[in-house]
Amino acid sequence: MTRFFFVVGALLAGLGVAAGAFGAHGLEGRVSPDRLETFRTAVTYQMYHALALLAVGWAAAQGGGPLVHGAGYCFVAGILVFSGSLYLLVLTDTSWLGAITPLGGAAFLVGWGLFAWGVWQGA
């Protein structure tokens, strides 16, 4: 399972770089400044949590238990729901997608709590 978090974290970080480049070079002038800022927010949170997945992989390799693994799954879910809904909101101009974005944010928060608790227990 350790490899899973390293691989998924690295892939999501790479996709975050690609999304950031797309936002900077492909969306500027095509969407409103507010929507461009929304896209940047999605990229930022994706990158932070992709890097967090690498930390989860490292902690799991050090013997992290189910709480650490749960944190990793929450980070993946958070990226898919939080960043994914914001990307789709910007690209499709479908505003109702903003209603599910907080669910991804909640997954991030739960993930950080699980990660802290799991690392504390393993110390």
Where are these regions (language model features)?
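Polytopic transmembrane helical bundles with strong interfacial aromatic enrichment
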Residues: 1-123
